[in-house]
Amino acid sequence: QMPELPEVEIVKQSLSKKIEQKKIKKVIIKNRNLRFKIPIKFEKLLQNKTIKKVTRFSKYLILNFDDDSFCLIHLGMSGTIHLIKKNTLNRFTNTSFYKSPELPKKHNHVEIQFEDINVIYNDPRRFGFFKFIKNKQALIKRFSHLGPEPFSRSFNLKYLLNYFVNKKKDIKMNKVLKYSLIGI
């Protein structure tokens, strides 16, 4: 089932503790065929970048690089992130939300290597994706169709009342709901 907003927040917090202020040494793509095909140049775009901060908007994880470019990560329906310390010979994995005694052997599609840790993206269904975003303007444009972040000041009773005024459809049937109330 699809990771919920709180799970994505926990993954963000776990990544923040482990990879912020660290330089990407190497990116290995084992399967480019995710929801959106990972371009051939993706590895080169990320290699040698330093992660300034890990953030989240809706269910998107955002790696903020020191050159003001970004990498969006969406876990899709079944994606998980595994954090592997390099000196453990892959015998232990901390997946930041789930605990597992060993690294899954199948469906590891993306590996981001740092000096002391590897970040592995595992996704049996391949509905997740990675996307390089070149600058802040492109990132803002990417999210412009979405509503406010649920924990922001702009997501309040006034916003909800304005959103639901004159809506005739059942809440569950409202197709734009996922864009107006992000994280659902």
Which role fits each region the language model picked out?
Residues 67, 71-183:
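Phosphate/anion-contacting hairpin/loop surfaces
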Residues 2-71, 75, 84-87, 91-94, ...:
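Extended, highly charged segments
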